[in-house]
From Swiss-Prot:
Gene Ontology biological process: asparaginyl-tRNA aminoacylation
Enzymatic reactions: tRNA(Asn) + L-asparagine + ATP = L-asparaginyl-tRNA(Asn) + AMP + diphosphate + H(+)
UniProt lineage: Bacteria, Bacillati, Bacillota, Bacilli, Bacillales
Molecular function, one GO term: ATP binding
Statement: the UniProt record of this protein carries the keyword Zinc: no
Complex formation: Homodimer.
EC number: 6.1.1.22
Pfam families from the UniProt entry: tRNA-synt_2 (PF00152), tRNA_anti-codon (PF01336)
Keyword list, A-Z: Aminoacyl-tRNA synthetase, ATP-binding, Cytoplasm, Ligase, Nucleotide-binding, Protein biosynthesis
Enzyme class: ligase
Family annotation (NCBIfam families): asnS, PRK03932.1, PRK05159.1
Recorded superkingdom: Bacteria
Protein name per UniProt: Asparagine--tRNA ligase
Family statement: Belongs to the class-II aminoacyl-tRNA synthetase family.
């Protein structure tokens, strides 16, 4: 019976056939141990010389790393295995023998592994990270579908930008200038006026010349927009969403979290509501902590965000940033025009901002004034301003960076390990 590693629990005591690759192997006299992987998981195959023919045992001893083969064996329960099962191998059929596989079990440098990213993905830790990434995406669709959101796909090629054009990749669109999208937000606002509650999930591109462990040039964002939703309701959606995806990973990715050595006790604390502090309070807190490099009106750097996050065991919202620090579309606070109704959600354990969101300006006159202040008066934004001419309503939204969120939940040291093929400042291949 042909099956996959993640389904062996259904076949205890039965002989099954699995198409697999050799992840690793070792032998001890009359027993060979094969670490098998098939994409769905990892399992140990045990080959006992006395229980198989000579050809099978010699194959088990000589088979090379990443050789593909069909493995036939009896499924047995094994409490010592992370999977809970092992395979008592009865026969091996080699499909393709791999020779000189470059990523051997020894330690390798990061640049070497990145040069071989197409192969590094096969490793146990990278496999676990990709499975957790997939679970976050799956849970995202479940959450927003359950909450009545409609999935909308904004364009990747745009003629305007929500935050200006200084960090955009420009290209020619026939005789016009176009940009790779850094956010679908403006289009999602239009969609929210038609469909009420919408979300998008897709790639975004930022030409930031940054080499930090938090930055990618190409990354994926989840961007919801909601009509008739104001600032505090927006924060509630965010904390409920983040709580949901974390709990989904805890429930459905136990083996993967164990593979990564993740301390799940920290993730178990991630349940709404999340603490909230204002930008003013954050500045005061940092000064009390001895940060002399920060003044009101300055943006926070990674050390500042980490210091603030260390005071909490959950993500923390920093709200009401100065107007001067934020994009043109954010609604001013009703009692203070020098701050806006926005929030950044800072993840624990030094992973930084994972969400940025705000209530959006819904008054046409104010929006036009803000566009003028930011030097964005052009036909490219005419359609966006026009949304405020026909039944404008209060509305809010946010964007969650998938890779930073995956890094936090996995406990990964760098976002480059959270996307299959990372695009970095100095890396376009593979």
């Amino acid at each position: 019976m042909k099956t996959t590693i993640n389904q062996v629990y259904k076949h205890v005591g039965e002989e099954v056939t699995i198409g697999a690759w050799i992840a690793n192997k070792r032998s001890s006299g009359k027993i060979a141990f094969l670490q098998l992987r098939d994409g769905t998981g990892f399992i140990q195959g045990v080959v006992v010389k006395a229980e198989v023919d000579e050809e099978t045992f010699q194959t088990a001893k000589s088979v090379t790393q990443e050789t593909s083969l069909y493995v036939k064996g009896v499924v047995k329960e094994d409490e010592r295995s992370p999977l809970g099962y092992e395979l008592a191998v009865t026969s091996l059929e080699v499909i393709h023998e791999a020779t000189d596989y470059p990523i051997t079990p020894k330690e390798h440098g990061t640049e070497f592994l990145m040069d071989h990213r197409h192969l590094w993905l096969r490793s146990k830790r990278q496999h676990a990270t990709m499975k957790i990434r997939n679970e976050i995406i799956r849970a995202t669709y479940e959450f927003f579908n359950k909450e009545g959101f409609v999935k909308v796909d904004p364009p990747i090629l745009t003629g305007s930008a929500p935050e200006g054009t200084t960090e955009l990749f420009a290209t020619k669109y026939f005789d016009e200038d176009a940009y790779l999208s850094q956010s679908g937000q403006l289009y999602m606002e239009a969609a929210a006026m038609a469909l009420g509650k919408v979300f998008s999930f897709g790639p975004t591109f930022r030409a930031e010349k940054s080499k930090t462990k938090r930055h990618l040039i190409e990354f994926w964002m989840i961007e919801p927009e909601m009509a008739f939703v104001e600032f505090n309701e927006n924060l509630e959606v965010q904390e409920n969403y983040v709580s949901f995806i974390v709990q989904s990973v805890l429930e459905n990715c136990k083996i993967e979290l164990n593979t990564l050595g993740r301390d799940t006790s920290k993730l178990e604390l991630i349940k709404a509501p999340f603490p909230r502090i204002t930008y003013d309070e954050a500045i005061q807190f940092l000064k009390e902590k001895g940060f002399d490099d920060i003044e009101w009106g300055d943006d926070f750097g990674a050390p500042h965000e980490t210091a603030i996050a260390e005071s909490y065991d959950k993500p923390v919202f920093i709200t009401h940033y100065p107007t001067s620090l934020k994009p043109f579309y954010m609604q001013p606070a009703p009692d203070r025009e020098d701050v806006v109704l926005c929030a950044d959600l800072i993840a624990p354990e030094g992973y930084g901002e994972i969400i940025g969101g705000s209530e959006r300006i819904h008054d046409l006159e104010l929006l036009e004034a803000r566009l003028k202040e930011h030097g964005l008066e052009s036909d490219a934004y005419q359609w966006y301003a026009e949304l405020r001419k026909y039944g404008s309503v209060p509305h809010s939204g946010f964007g969650l960076g998938l890779e930073r969120t995956v890094a936090w939940i996995c406990g990964s040291p760098h976002v480059r390990e959270t996307i299959p093929f990372p695009r970095l400042l100095n890396r376009l291949y593979p």
